[in-house]
């Protein structure tokens, strides 16, 4: 598929990098990015409760992935992932699933304080792989990382740096 012609809003730039997540298709129509909702919880340790774990815990409960990330004051538990348009409100079902799964892995979390429920939208591609590369001679894309955005940030930064330095020139093949 040949990508559409794109005129960057900043015309004096030599190269434009599209890194605007779920809204990338607004700047490059046809880019196969869709929003996927994700929820996480922050659980605060309370006096008398079992201590915060010392390491990240990853598990699978009832076919769902759950992770527990230790923080100074408690644990971040996550995460859901499902198609729900552009809704960014935490849903009771998502919160319940995370709590059930987290407590199945570490039952003592049931006594922690539920400090925060948060939801956001992740840019996802049809094949689940990020789009990082040239779209045309003046436009790079760095989007579609899904739930692994923070994890892949160092790789993406290095890849974009290499592309800008001219070390790699192949164009992204869009489905």
Roles of regions detected by a PLM:
Residues 1-10:
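A conserved short coil-to-beta-strand element within the FAD-binding core of flavoproteins
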Residues 108-175:
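C-terminal catalytic lobe of FAD-dependent flavoproteins
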Residues 22-137:
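Active-site substrate-recognition segment that forms the wall
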Residues 11-23, 157:
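Short hydrophobic core segments
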Residues 1-2, 15, 39:
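Generic beta-strand structural signal
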Residues 8, 77, 140-142:
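Generic recognition of long tandem-repeat/solenoid scaffolds
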